Amino acid sequence: KPWKMMGRMHDKYLIADGKTYILGGRNTYNYFLGDFPGHKNFDRDVLVVCDEPQKDNSVNQLWNYFETIWEQEDCRYFHNSKKLADRQSVKKAVLELQEGYQQYFEVNKEKICDTDYADETFETEKITLLSNSIHTQAKEPVVWYQLGELMKNAKERVKIHTPYIICNDMMYNTW
């Protein structure tokens, strides 16, 4: 069905140990990873640590979102066959990734192992995760509406930290 061809999951998140997650905006195309002159695009990742995970928090909200996605009819393994893993090109790619990680780790191990994330993060009063409806067809702007409602309730200011939004002039000037 042509209207489903572009239906893909673009979510990037990693949930660890039931109390920590990373929301990512990291894209792997060279435009985003390379060091090119001119316009520089910075993808941002958001680290969230919930010291005391309660029932109503963003860690559990993200976990429930994952479960909902996982159960969708459209969600399935792209390739899950032994034949694919046995291909020489796949074996080569796996080896390149392993070697690349090892090199990265050797150069950055102090940052990786000795970073006190509590010193490099700040406490929030509230984290609200938003998403549009979960289907492959065109979507209504539900997230934009939800953002507007949250902004209307702000006491003093609104700070949006997300790797996913690109605002146009109308969006900046609406609320």
Please place each PLM-identified region on the residue numbering.
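Charged, low-complexity intrinsically disordered terminal segments
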Residues: K1-K12, A16-W175
